[in-house]
């Protein structure tokens, strides 16, 4: 069975999964993006995935995470701040292009709508490397790109289907 044919399970992650999820996100970032970023941008990213910072937010329900697993191996992570802000979305490069990120995002939206069925919109500050992906998911830019720590971000929104 090829990597593409393996079944992928999407499930909510909790505090017990946080360290593994953040380590996974760092490993993907380090392999795919860090080389193109300056030291300030890498440090900024590391602060975003700091265990203590994230643990507090998971503990109080502000940060929610989902994982994609293939044969019990973590191959993708999605995190939302609150119900509608995409915080992280990272997929193992070997599993990219197989719909894993799309499935993670859809599950996160589904779970968010279970908490608030009137969810008005989703927001993402998409880095330059992810604008195309989010555009394909129906997100539209709501402003001009802005630069922070050498990385260009575009705020994008999506109005979920009822």
Regions found by a protein language model. Give the residues of each.
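Conserved acetyl-CoA-binding loop-helix of GNAT-fold acetyltransferases
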Residues: 97-110
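Conserved GNAT acetyl-CoA-binding A-motif
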Residues: 112-127
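Conserved beta-hairpin
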Residues: 62-76, 81
């Amino acid at each position: 069975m090829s990597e593409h044919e393996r079944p992928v399970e999407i499930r909510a992650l909790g505090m017990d999964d946080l360290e593994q999820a953040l380590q996974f996100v760092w490993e993907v970032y380090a392999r795919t993006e860090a080389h193109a970023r300056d030291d300030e941008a890498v440090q900024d990213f590391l602060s975003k995935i700091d265990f203590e910072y994230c643990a507090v937010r998971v503990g109080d329900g502000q940060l929610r995470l989902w994982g994609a697993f293939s044969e019990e191996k973590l191959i993708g992570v999605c995190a939302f701040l609150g119900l509608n802000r995409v915080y992280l979305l990272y997929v193992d490069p070997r599993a990219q292009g197989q719909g894993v990120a799309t499935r993670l995002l859809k599950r996160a939206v589904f779970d968010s709508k279970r908490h608030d069925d009137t969810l008005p919109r989703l927001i993402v500050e998409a880095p330059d490397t992810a604008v195309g992906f989010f555009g394909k998911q129906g997100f539209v830019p709501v402003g001009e790109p802005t630069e922070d720590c050498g990385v260009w971000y575009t705020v994008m929104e999506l109005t979920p289907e009822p």
